[in-house]
Amino acid sequence: MSILKIHAREIFDSRGNPTVEVDLYTNKGLFRAAVPSGASTGIYEALELRDNDKTRYMGKGVSKAVEHINKTIAPALISKNVNVVEQDKIDKLMLDMDGSENKSKFGANAILGVSLAVCKAGAAEKGVPLYRHIADLAGNPEVILPVPAFNVINGGSHAGNKLAMQEFMIPPCGADSFKEAMRIGAEVYHNLKNVIKEKYGKDATNVGDEGGFAPNILENKEALELLKTAIGKAGYSDKVVIGMDVAASEFYRDGKYDLDFKSPDDPSRYISPDQLADLYKGFVKNYPVVSIEDPFDQDDWGAWKKFTGSVGIQVVGDDLTVTNPKRIAKAVEEKACNCLLLKVNQIGSVTESLQACKLAQSNGWGVMVSHRSGETEDTFIADLVVGLCTGQIKTGAPCRSERLAKYNQLLRIEEELGSKARFAGRNFRNPRIN
């Protein structure tokens, strides 16, 4: 079925910044998609088009991206009369019209908004759930429920505390189902709140952009200690492990790293990549840390390669790979990491996101689907992670509605699948083997 109408508008993300929403109409009805936005962004990401008009929304308006959709993309797609099930064809049309390497003409936020809406319309056209349509597009005969990696302590660019490392996560990989993983995550989260309140006072339980707590601690080890205590108090030491997103590009300084980057600059405290790697190895030895994301700067290839080759844990590329097939191919060649963080807005279309995922999986990598810190109530990534069978998702703490929207959608999907539901569990790095 072809597209009858496309209308884009500015709406607000969870940080109160404008973002793009797209309404797409076919004979089957209205299909709506909204685009997220990141705070710690990799320099190689596709371009998110902002107006840069300082008199409006501090320059963060997206009226130009909206106009590109309404004035250029919409008429072109409607006149071409393409069927909404032809995702790759529609995405290619938009990419060809944009013509730039990084989607800087229309903006990745414009192209992605339409691409997501097309995908939802395609599922309705086929009369199947969105996750099934995505699985079909990716050539996956089965679907898998992911282990949720709840980001329960926030630092880095997501929080106003001194903590350098951005996310401390608790994936309940020992759960038997997604529903049980949610319960475990929520119970650990509430235990963590009490542990933090007792140690640092009630104001330390204020939450960051992704719903995690942001106590004013400086030592990253202290965050791990808090998690270990909370997991133990909740009674889940055998079922919950720890993941981290260091976002090291945020504190990379002249070939070294500044673990106190939110204080006044002092080069004497910078540490070398080797010293940082030793710190991580200490974490892995003393805590159940099974996954570390962006342990080094996005261009510090040597440090990545050396670290990944020396540890048995999951090493996730985010700023390093930016969901871009070219960067992923280089990281595969260099053996720089062993897991891809998949963010649809880093690359800017559904088709390219699927290509990035399949490239990583075909090289033996794990894949983790991810939200952004500036989110909306859109739940597309919940269906995406199930259809792509990646086995892991991070979309914040079990707190703040824009985060729970995704987790709740996953609960519904598991319920709908009934006895056919498969949960990745401890095989989250390679969920298809069990």
UniProtKB/Swiss-Prot annotation:
Q: Which UniProt keywords apply?
A: Cytoplasm, Eye lens protein, Glycolysis, Lyase, Magnesium, Metal-binding
| Cofactors | Mg(2+)
Q: Could you tell me the EC number(s) of this protein?
A: 4.2.1.11
Top-tier EC class: lyase
Residues at which Mg(2+) 2 binds: 245, 293, 318
Residues reported to bind Mg(2+) 1: 40
* Pfam family of the protein (one): Enolase_N
What family name appears in the similarity comment?
A: Belongs to the enolase family.
- Gene behind this protein: ENO1
Query: For binding substrate, which residues are annotated in this chain's numbering?
Result: 158, 167, 293, 318, 370-373, 394
Catalytically driven reaction(s): (2R)-2-phosphoglycerate = phosphoenolpyruvate + H2O
Q: How is the cofactor bound?
A: Binds two Mg(2+) per subunit. Required for catalysis and for stabilizing the dimer.
Originating species:
Anas platyrhynchos
Q: What does this protein do?
A: Both an enzyme and a lens structural protein.
Protein name listed in UniProt: Alpha-enolase
The record's section on HAMAP family has: Enolase
Q: In which pathway does it act?
A: Carbohydrate degradation; glycolysis; pyruvate from D-glyceraldehyde 3-phosphate: step 4/5
User: Mind listing the GO biological process terms from this record?
Assistant: glycolytic process
Catalytic positions are 210 (proton donor), 343 (proton acceptor)
Any one GO CC term of this protein is: phosphopyruvate hydratase complex
**GO molecular function, a single term:** magnesium ion binding
